[in-house]
């Protein structure tokens, strides 16, 4: 039985989304097994297109959060303004806390605090102008989870979390970016 033992790559890190880690592992296994590039491209394109069907929790970024006060620059209405240079995951944690207040459930649910482990996602354009949102992964209010499900930005999650990692493999093999043959052929007709 051939078994792949990987160390040092994002696909095995605990702070990398599960579904994306599984894809990277299968891509790496395919590369090592000399699977043709077009088959690997197909796997990647299929994953990218099916991300909307994957449970958001499997593509959310797990991380620890700290320095929340440092990056809070006061409130503008219901939502916190962020200090320059605030990391996306810190913004996401603060946004979760703001949403607890906005939805009127801050008395029922604990806010995210420094040194907690959270998961977070990028958001598409929404009525509050929020870029990202975190959650605890347990005892989260349905209002926040529904908001995340409605506005999760799958394209940005793919671009920020996965595309660069895939391109590291591809560039080292002198391969071009994965191409969806179906849509690229349709352009000619």
What feature does the model see in each segment?
Residues 1-189:
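DNA-dependent DNA polymerase catalytic subunits
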């Amino acid at each position: 039985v051939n078994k792949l033992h990987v160390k040092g790559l994002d696909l095995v890190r605990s702070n990398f989304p599960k579904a994306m880690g599984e894809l990277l592992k299968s891509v790496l296994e395919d590369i090592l097994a000399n699977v043709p590039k077009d088959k690997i491209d197909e796997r990647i394109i299929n994953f990218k297109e099916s991300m909307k069907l994957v449970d958001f929790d499997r593509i959310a970024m797990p991380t620890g959060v700290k320095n929340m006060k440092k990056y809070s620059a006061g409130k503008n209405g219901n939502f916190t303004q962020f200090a320059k240079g605030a990391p996306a995951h810190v913004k996401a944690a603060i946004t979760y806390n703001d949403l607890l207040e906005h939805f009127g459930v801050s008395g029922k649910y604990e806010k995210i605090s420094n040194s907690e482990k959270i998961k977070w996602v990028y958001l598409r354009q929404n009525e509050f102008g929020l870029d990202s949102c975190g959650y605890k992964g347990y005892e989260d209010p349905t209002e926040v989870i529904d908001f995340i499900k409605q506005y999760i930005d799958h394209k940005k999650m793919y671009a920020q979390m996965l595309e660069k990692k895939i391109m590291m493999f591809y560039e080292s093999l002198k391969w071009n970016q994965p191409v969806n043959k179906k849509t690229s052929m349709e352009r000619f007709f």
